Design a protein with these regions (language model features):
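Acyltransferase donor/substrate-recognition loop-hinge adjacent to the catalytic core
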Residues: 3, 148-226, 250
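TRNA-binding/sensing appendages of the translation machinery
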Residues: 1-40, 109
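A conserved beta-strand-loop-helix scaffold within acyl/acetyltransferase catalytic domains
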Residues: 21-62, 70-80, 200, 205-308
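A structural motif corresponding to the C-terminal lobe/cap of the Radical SAM core domain
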Residues: 359-370
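Acyl-donor binding region in acyl/amide transferases
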Residues: 80-162, 277-360
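Short beta-strand segments
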Residues: 121, 173, 253, 265, ...
Length: 375
């Protein structure tokens, strides 16, 4: 029987869109279902992305059963910045069925083409500041917080619809512990500079400190492929969301002569705490999550931001700043009981950052692929 594609308006019922993953990943022990609340907020018309973006939501049905999902979206800030006439697809999950995949991506492509896009790229949920890529390597371990997980067949299905790889992103596994001598020297050198000071984020000033971190991030990452800075509204929403899970010791703001120059931000790996919640925080999921986070504590985390302001990046005196940040975050991980973390993602051609992670002993253990097709 043929595949039926249904479009759901923003703000409409997401029941099938949310629940289809239970069927797709029913026999995958590594899959961790994201929280329904997070996806509903992301796809709500009130989400700050939609101040500069638009999207459509698609679900696929065969014999009346939901068997796949995806979104199509346009980020007008991306278009203004890069001028590449690229629209995105995201939230891509499907059974092992080429027709289902093809019909979903065709629906997304047609929606984007009707709005003037010349190419479609993804998966992005919803843009580069969200969940990025299709997992093509590292299926044997669970995903960490805010990173994707897919079945091994899904990347091949995407390629079979005419998409090709445009970029790989690396997920690095890092074991918290002793650091190499070269990194120890970098830590000691920067610690010995009187103009350099470091502090953690203040939970009583979360809005202020998240803005500081993201300001340095926006500056330091501004020349990277596909980058789009967070807007003021997105910064405000991010600070509000992080306040609930932020561990101050896993944040770092490094100042030079009183000016924020380098930052790092790691989050507890919420996925290790929600695997049995099946996406639901209520009626008892929230209590379980808070106990596991605040009382039991995380055993792993994800370093999502590490950046240096451009004006300091090529100053010889501060060449050790990136290794200093890694070393300080390693110390923070030990102090908070974290045993390991995922660093990244990082772009495959971001050689300076990738080299620094290798120096710390990080190893690539997951690969997230971005695909593109001309329309």
């Amino acid at each position: 029987m043929s595949v039926e594609i249904r479009e759901t308006p923003l703000g409409g019922s997401l029941r099938d869109f949310l629940n289809v993953v239970d069927y797709i990943y029913r026999d995958d022990p590594q899959y961790v279902r994201p929280l329904n609340m997070d996806i509903k907020e992301t796809l709500s018309p009130k989400h700050p992305f939609f101040e500069h973006g638009e999207a459509a939501i698609f679900t696929a049905y065969r014999n009346g059963w939901c068997v796949g999902r995806c979104t199509a979206q346009i980020d007008h800030l991306h278009l203004e910045r890069h001028g590449d006439e690229a629209g995105f697809f995201g939230f891509f999950d499907t059974i092992d069925d080429q027709e289902v995949c093809s019909e979903l991506l065709e629906a997304a492509s047609n929606w984007l083409s009707a709005r003037g896009m010349k190419r479609v790229r993804g998966p992005y949920s919803l843009n580069c500041n969200g969940v990025v890529g299709c997992l093509v390597e590292g299926f044997e371990t669970p995903p960490v917080f805010l990173n994707p997980h897919h079945r091994p067949y899904q990347g091949g299905l995407i390629e079979s619809t005419g998409f090709s790889k445009i970029k790989d992103c690396y997920g690095w596994r890092y074991q918290v512990g002793d650091i190499p001598q070269r990194v120890r020297k970098a830590l000691d050198d920067v610690n010995g500079m009187p103009e350099v000071s470091s502090r953690h984020a203040d939970l009583h000033q979360v809005q202020r400190d998240i803005r500081v971190i993201m300001d340095v991030y926006n500056d330091g990452w501004s020349e990277h492929w596909g980058f789009v800075p967070l807007t003021e509204a997105e910064l405000t929403a991010l600070a509000r969301e992080l306040r609930l899970i932020l561990i101050p010791e896993l944040t770092l703001i490094t100042e030079i002569n009183g000016e924020p120059a380098a930052v790092a931000l790691a989050l507890p790996n919420i996925n290790e705490m929600i695997g049995d919640l099946r996406g639901k925080l209520f009626p008892v999921g929230l209590a379980k999550l808070l106990w596991r986070l605040k009382i039991k504590g995380p055993k792993s985390g994800r370093l999502i931001i590490l950046g240096i302001r451009k004006s300091y990046r090529n100053v010889r005196k501060y060449a050790a700043l990136s290794l200093y940040l890694y070393a300080k975050m390693n110390e923070a991980g030990m102090a908070t009981g974290c045993e390991w973390g995922e660093l990244g993602w990082t772009l495959e051609d971001n050689h300076p950052v990738n080299t620094g992670i290798k120096m710390m002993g990080g190893k690539i253990y997951k690969r997230y692929r971005l695909y593109e097709r001309e329309l």
